[in-house]
Amino acid sequence: MKRFTAILLTGMMIFTLASCGKKAQDTPTEPETETQAVEKVEMPTETEAVTEVVTEAVKDTQQTEAQQEEQTAEQPDEEQNNSGENNSSYQYVERASYENGESVSLNPSWQYADHSAINSGCAVMYKATANRKNIVVGVNAGHGTSGGTSVKTLCHPDGSAKTTGGTTGAGATKAVAVSGGMSFNDGTPESSVTLRMAQILKDKLLAAGYDVLMVRDGSDVQLDNVARTVICNNAADCHIALHWDGDGLSYDKGCFYISVPGGIKGMEPVASHWQQHDALGASLIEGLRAHGAKINGNGSMAIDLTQTSYSTVPSVDVELGNACSDHSDATLENLADGLVQGVEGYF
């Protein structure tokens, strides 16, 4: 359209100049000969020439625009690409590459690695064998670090105080490296259930074509919350921490994710990633809802977490119930199906 407008304006200028030239010739100094008169009749006027040029330009422009429309229609919709790169809420991150079954330890050169206090353990990488999507999901079975409550780490990378309460109260600048977790009403430790949940989720993600970084692959891993987060930042495309809430209630209140509170949205790296964190959490809750899981309230609760404060990939803590919740394998299988659907919805 811009090309057509430029051509039309050029044609109008030529037309104007032609008109001016014609006026200058209206009073000839000598009478025309018969031959000159014939030539004048047979030759097209300058106005007719301009009209012909503009007409041809219009035809060329219309043909060009039609070709451009055909090319646009043939281009694939980038939002349908399943690699995750084109998701509007996902920013592709360069990550380290590991083989199937390879241990992934904390590299001291990684950003925020020096904030970790417990980091002698390793995560484990598992690769899908079919329909691989080239997406690594970090699965973090909450708790399960012996000695985790005996040391503390900074709540925020910049040393600022927590803005909301949780396991650690608002105003604190340090939190226990890894809390011990609660126990279900039947006495089962939360750390045992989160590990079983992680194992079931791992198998389902692998079957769906996702690679899985198992942050805790056994009953105990010597990685604190900062180390777990930093490893996921560098070896995974997202980080999902599995928990059940120790709220002390006498009924099962359902699932929810920990959203990012407003008080830390201006702090880096949260400022650059909080929308991704919340988008991932919301997608997981929708997946759980679709599989019939009970959802607490609107599905989210804003809490200032160490995990969120250090994350540079989409990261969320999902609470799958509380001490009153059923944690049989059948229930965990269903929850895992919902989480896989949520992962697929996000990517």
Feature names for model-found ranges:
Residues 1-8:
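Positively charged n-region of N-terminal signal peptides that target proteins for export
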Residues 4, 13-14, 21-347:
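Catalytic-site microenvironment of enzymes
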